[in-house]
């Protein structure tokens, strides 16, 4: 596992739509390991591959809850959203020292592949749902700043 360099606001890869992973292999598993290592070293709760310069649809989330445990999401897709939304402050490892209130769905169901290439679904509420939506936005080239209303 390697701690990778974080790309910050202004890096073109952060605005790229990440490519789907064709096959989950050892290279993708190493990427997942590096994402977890980099996220933890930076004291984050989520990280998308394009934040370390890799434009593939891979993200990790660990908000410190045991159920579900830390998540590796390969080719994640939100398949269900609760209409109810919640507004809370967000920040981003790629946008240091800037925070803002972002409205997100309170509950989401995500379909993805695990590190063995097996499909799974996860239902997330609250903070975990927020973190997952934030990371999937990254994979679509969207930053939390894009959700902020002009003041």
Descriptions of predicted regions:
Residues 1-151:
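Positively charged
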């Amino acid at each position: 596992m390697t701690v990778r360099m974080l790309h910050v606001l202004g890096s073109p890869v952060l605005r790229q739509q990440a490519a789907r992973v064709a096959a989950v292999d050892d290279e993708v598993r190493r990427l997942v390991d590096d994402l977890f290592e980099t996220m933890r070293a930076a004291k984050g709760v989520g990280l998308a591959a394009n934040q370390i310069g890799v434009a593939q649809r891979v993200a990790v989330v660990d908000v410190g809850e045991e159920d579900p445990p830390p998540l590796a999401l390969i080719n994640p897709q939100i398949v269900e959203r609760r209409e109810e939304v919640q507004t809370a402050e967000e920040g981003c490892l790629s946008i240091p020292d800037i925070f803002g209130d972002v409205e997100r769905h309170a509950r989401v169901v995500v379909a993805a592949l695990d590190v063995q290439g097996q499909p799974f679904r996860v239902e997330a509420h609250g903070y975990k749902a927020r973190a997952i939506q934030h990371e999937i936005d990254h994979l679509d080239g969207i930053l939390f700043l894009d959700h902020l209303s002009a003041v």
